[in-house]
Amino acid sequence: QHWSYGLRPGGKRNAERLGDSFQEMDKEVDQLAEPQHLECTVHWPRSPLRDLRGVLESLIEEE
């Protein structure tokens, strides 16, 4: 039972809204079934450790 779907704690349900709640859940399930285009919006600042790692790797490759 989940309160956001009009269900109440203790098993009590609002009978008038119960049909609406199930329709809402059905729509959400349909949306989840559709493929989602996700794209990363987090841009990490350059890490000094990553830069150092790159320098060390290039030095090792030169040897």
Swiss-Prot record:
Modified residues (Glycine amide): G10
Main subcellular localisation: secreted
Site (Cleavage): W3, S4, Y5, G6, L7, R8, G10, G11
GO CC term (a single one): extracellular space
Protein keywords: Amidation, Cleavage on pair of basic residues, Hormone, Pyrrolidone carboxylic acid, Secreted
Superkingdom of source: Eukaryota
Entry-annotated residues carrying Pyrrolidone carboxylic acid: Q1
Cell compartments where the protein resides: Secreted
UniProt site positions, description: Appears to be essential for biological activity: W3
Listed GO MF terms: gonadotropin hormone-releasing hormone activity; gonadotropin-releasing hormone receptor binding
Family: Belongs to the GnRH family.
Function comment: Stimulates the secretion of gonadotropins; it stimulates the secretion of both luteinizing and follicle-stimulating hormones.
Name of this protein: Progonadoliberin-1
